[in-house]
């Protein structure tokens, strides 16, 4: 079956009638079975496109959570539904509230640093990752560690670049709102 034929079938009246019945069962099965075979660089874009489609179709654009059971909640991020396990019940196979917190923080720092470098006419690749040190006994995050990876082509003063990256990271509203210790590491590649 060629791609043109599949696209033609997708636009047919039969597909429009069958899709609401089949898609809820077929899409998860197809993703489970075939996602691993999509090349990694294409997989990232594919997943991002799916999420963008889901979010763009949601009317409410709200962020909310619904308690399900011990350590489990159904999260709604602008139409994207996520089964989440958190706290002492967190498992790597599920996205935890802590994962979403860190993703938001890393995204915010990444954008703040990227905009700062761009405003200073520095073209760079920026990636940010993070982890937390938490205490269930104290019921809080004790420390957040953020690693800011910066790759710049060309000759630039490394100390000046590090200083600029750290200055840019201070423009992140999320990190400015956190009361625990935040360690920011700049890694020049």
Swiss-Prot record:
| TM helices/strands, residue ranges | none
Q: What is this protein called?
A: Uncharacterized protein MJ0573
Taxonomic lineage is: Archaea, Methanobacteriati, Methanobacteriota, Methanomada group, Methanococci
Reading the lineage from the top rank, the first entry is Archaea
Tell me what organism the protein belongs to.
Answer: Methanocaldococcus jannaschii (strain ATCC 43067 / DSM 2661 / JAL-1 / JCM 10045 / NBRC 100440)
Recorded hits in SUPFAM superfamilies, A to Z, give:
OsmC-like
Family, per entry: Belongs to the OsmC/Ohr family.
Q: Which InterPro entries match?
A: KH_dom-like_a/b, OsmC/Ohr_fam, OsmC/Ohrsf
Q: Name one Pfam family in it.
A: OsmC
């Amino acid at each position: 079956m060629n791609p043109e034929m599949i696209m033609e079938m997708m636009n047919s009246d039969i597909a429009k009638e069958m899709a609401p019945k089949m898609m809820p069962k077929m899409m998860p099965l197809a993703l489970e079975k075939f996602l691993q075979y999509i090349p990694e660089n294409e997989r990232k874009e594919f997943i991002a496109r799916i999420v963008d489609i889901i979010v763009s179709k949601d009317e409410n654009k709200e962020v909310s959570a619904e308690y399900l059971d011990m350590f489990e909640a159904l999260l709604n991020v602008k139409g994207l539904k996520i089964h989440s396990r958190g706290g002492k019940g967190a498992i790597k196979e599920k996205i935890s509230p802590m994962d979403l917190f860190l993703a938001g923080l890393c995204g915010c720092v990444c954008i703040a640093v990227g905009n700062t470098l761009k405003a200073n006419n520095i073209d760079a690749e920026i990636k940010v990752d993070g982890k937390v040190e938490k205490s269930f006994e104290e019921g809080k995050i004790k420390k957040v560690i953020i690693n800011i990876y910066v790759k710049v082509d060309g000759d630039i003063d490394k100390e000046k670049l590090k200083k600029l990256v750290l200055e840019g990271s201070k423009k992140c509203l999320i990190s400015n709102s956190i009361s625990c210790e935040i360690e920011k590491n700049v890694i020049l590649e």
